[in-house]
């Protein structure tokens, strides 16, 4: 019979193995109104296309760092299980915005009640410029209103339907990074990198890759 020492070694090996082949799934519901959806379509892209392409690119970058981190035994991939839909709650109107960001905080609380256990991103049809002072005071470059929830392991974000490509991609990337559990804001940046003969290409850069800190280290 195996002794307790060998049993512990076996269990530890099973844990490491499960971490190596498992997936950290982050369920995310993105809400947008018909007017907000039309803003993107008028610019030639659907909101589904934007969220999908950014989520895929962000996953790849995060998982590159997961495998490169020699200090971590948790090699599970991150994966965003995202969905885009219209707002069903009668208490939330994504086409109406208040004088300050307090309205968005209230709506996030309501949305979280309707979608327990899932991170929520609310896309308001208004422009972020009207709230620039609020974000400056909060020390944020990206216009995100954030509600972090412990220990529920889901973080909710309210933001805006910006149609300038780099701006909305930065917004969605940072919002998704927060839904994955990032304790810090503005941790995702887009930059141009030299791609040799092909010229410059746009790439995602992560300013933090210590995923053990995500959601207090207890989620995913």
Swiss-Prot record:
Keyword Thylakoid attached: no
Residues bearing glycans: 83
Residues making up the signal peptide according to the UniProt record: 1-20
Record keywords: Glycoprotein, Signal, Sporulation
GO CC annotation terms, alphabetical: spore wall
A GO biological process held by the record: sporulation resulting in formation of a cellular spore
Keyword Cytoplasm annotated: no
A matching Pfam family: MICSWaP
Main localisation: other
Localization in the cell: Spore wall
Stated name of the protein: Spore wall protein ECU02_0150
Organism of derivation: Encephalitozoon cuniculi (strain GB-M1) (Microsporidian parasite)
């Amino acid at each position: 019979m195996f002794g307790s020492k060998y049993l512990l070694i076996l269990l530890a090996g099973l844990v490491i193995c499960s971490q190596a082949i498992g997936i950290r799934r982050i369920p995310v519901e993105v809400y947008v109104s018909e007017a907000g959806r039309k803003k993107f379509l008028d610019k030639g892209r659907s909101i589904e296309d934007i969220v999908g392409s950014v989520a895929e690119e962000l996953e790849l970058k995060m998982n590159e760092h997961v495998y490169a981190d020699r200090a971590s035994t948790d090699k599970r991939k991150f994966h965003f299980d995202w969905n885009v839909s219209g707002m069903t709650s009668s208490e939330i109107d994504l086409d109406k915005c208040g004088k300050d960001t307090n309205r968005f905080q209230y709506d996030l609380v309501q949305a979280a009640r309707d979608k327990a256990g899932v991170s929520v991103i609310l896309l308001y049809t208004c422009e972020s410029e009207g709230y620039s002072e609020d974000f400056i005071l909060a020390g944020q470059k990206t216009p995100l209103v954030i509600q972090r929830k412990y220990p529920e392991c889901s973080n909710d974000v309210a933001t805006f339907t910006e149609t300038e490509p780099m701006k909305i991609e930065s917004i969605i990337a940072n919002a998704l990074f927060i839904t994955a559990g990032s304790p810090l804001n503005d941790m995702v940046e887009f930059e141009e990198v030299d791609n040799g003969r092909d010229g410059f290409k746009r790439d995602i850069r992560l300013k933090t890759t210590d995923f053990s800190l995500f959601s207090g280290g207890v989620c995913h």
